[in-house]
């Protein structure tokens, strides 16, 4: 069955394995996860739990700032006897009977050796050319060449007479939702609500990440 939790990417470090191998790991802090709602097949058409992460400030009349919860969000969180949450996600394909509304989801949901998928928003790189953005090759840099880092041909002339949608061109790079699959949980620190994940995960430091059981290897 699927397991899931939300957290913040703290950064990277290194730990030693049992055999003395040096392992690069990403530190993810995953505290303050609370079940806000249970969804069942009878009522909602599918089974899922809705999890909230990080407290948001209570409703403030007249304020339009995102740091304050609105009244519907405050009322929704009140049913779970908790504060309004900044981030809310659903996790499906799990046994909803194991969860109760208001229950805290802690890092011990996962164990050392679990294979997981990690989803985050990739680092924004701003406007970049085709070489950095798509890995295209460059032209000769000498011998009279006038073609260095330009994209090259982007379409045909008379027949089609247009640039097709999806053509790889310069543009804004990064800031996309990215999932890295089949990463391994190296260590779970319940005292500090921290999970150590082997390798790197998407996003900058302090970026939101979603950890779920691997969709490909989780049930093996």
Swiss-Prot record:
SUPFAM superfamilies per record: Translation proteins
Keywords, alphabetical: Ribonucleoprotein, Ribosomal protein, RNA-binding, rRNA-binding
Any one of the GO CC terms: cytosolic large ribosomal subunit
One GO term of the biological process aspect: translation
Classification via InterPro entries: Ribosomal_uL3, Ribosomal_uL3_bac/org-type, Ribosomal_uL3_CS, Transl_B-barrel_sf
Function per UniProt: One of the primary rRNA binding proteins, it binds directly near the 3'-end of the 23S rRNA, where it nucleates assembly of the 50S subunit.
Protein's name according to its UniProt entry: Large ribosomal subunit protein uL3
